Each structure stands twice: as structure tokens, then as C-alpha cells.
Amino acid sequence: HTGVWEATPGVTRSIKGDTFEFCHLLSGVVEITPDGGSPVIYKAGDSFVMKPGFVGVWKTVETVRKIYVTVTPPA
């Protein structure tokens, strides 16, 4: 799956399950904190991958717009 996603500031719980998600931020700022880990800040122009099994907090600091690609490996 691919798409464009946008969100206003706020906090949500993120649970990836068995899916990889590639993200490229077109605008905005997010802070992603894995459970038991340290927060990482991503800004417009940054790209990152959320791996299967990720559990943590996604905080939209500034309204964010991203393109994404999700891939679920075969069982």
C-alpha cells in the first residue's frame, strides 16, 4: 500500500504488527518513542522505516504530511 497521510498535532499509540512502513516527511515534525526507548525527532525531508513489532508513541509536534509505503512480508 502507498499513500499520502496528514495529521494535526497530537499523540497516538503506534503498534506496527507484522508490517514494515517506509515514511518520508513532506512537511512538519514528529517525535517517535519506542516503548522503553528514547524519543527520535523527524522533520520535513527526513525518511525512516518503522519495523514490524514496533510498539510506542507517535507524537505529531507540527502538522505533518508524509508519503508512505507499507509492506507485509509473506508468512
Tell where the protein language model's regions lie, with residue ranges.
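Conserved short histidine dyad/triad with adjacent acidic residue
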Residues: H1-G17, K51-G53, P74-A75
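Histidine-centered metal-chelating micro-motifs
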Residues: T12, S38, S47-F48, P52-V57
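Short, conserved beta-strand element in jelly-roll/cupin
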Residues: G17-I32
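Short alpha-helix capping/helix-loop boundary micro-motifs
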Residues: T33-G37
